[in-house]
């Protein structure tokens, strides 16, 4: 049976399929973990420890050495994405109720959901798109996008926007596994190769544990809103990213569109933030469902939009080149 190949046909499948299975488990048998106990309970409830190992391995996979072009492109996209998420957070905090929208079509929408969906790019999706439509340097720009993985950037955005306050040691605790992994991976290439193999392997495990915090009725209630959130992520982050790529990154805007997705790891952010700030716990399930839907939507639409944009840009460049030759 080609189970893995079938799952990978779904955008973000290795994250979303286990997430859905976990949600099924939680919806129809919420006490399964406590009933079985031991290792089974650990797999069902171990979101935070599994993610801690994943962040460590993610840090170990990042190479410190990169060309100036790669760093400029990557830095431009990362900073722009985070800046846009901060602006959205600042505006949303003045419009959306403190505990999120509780009634009507927008029920479940919160500042936490918006920031989590917008501040993190799907680095793997970006790299695969740019390998097809961009240069090697542009494809390699995902090197700094891994720094967005995890709750740190979301914590910084929520903290600096005045939406939440975090003690300094909480910030350190959130980033320490990543930094230790980063240090070890760059001190020893063999360790980098060893730990980086676990990055993809651990995704289904933390996705399943994360799914066990979600009730499927919440997904049903936030389905259409999640689709709209995914479209909003592409529009709201995509336009500034295109402009930044052209003006600062030295590109033609293609990399900007390719970076306008939501990362699969962003699905875990609401739960992790809620662990640190209990005030966010009531919003976490709905925010997780919204972000999960946004991940699917952006994973489908971003490659299509990037393809259309790239073809138009290249056609325009070819036309200008022909006109220049004629003259």
From Swiss-Prot:
It comes from the Bacteria. Keywords: Cell inner membrane, Cell membrane, Membrane, Sugar transport, Symport, Transmembrane, Transmembrane helix, Transport. Coiled coil: none annotated. It is found in: Cell inner membrane. GO terms for molecular function: 2-keto-3-deoxygluconate:proton symporter activity. The keyword Transport applies. It catalyses: 2-dehydro-3-deoxy-D-gluconate(in) + H(+)(in) = 2-dehydro-3-deoxy-D-gluconate(out) + H(+)(out). The chain crosses the membrane at residues 10-30, 42-62, 73-93, 95-115, 139-159, 163-183, 199-219, 224-244, 254-274, 289-309. Pfam families: KdgT. It is a multi-pass membrane protein. Signal peptide: none annotated. GO terms for cellular component: plasma membrane. Catalyzes the proton-dependent uptake of 2-keto-3-deoxygluconate (KDG) into the cell. NCBIfam families: kdgT. Belongs to the KdgT transporter family. This is 2-keto-3-deoxygluconate permease. It comes from Escherichia coli O139:H28 (strain E24377A / ETEC). The gene is kdgT.
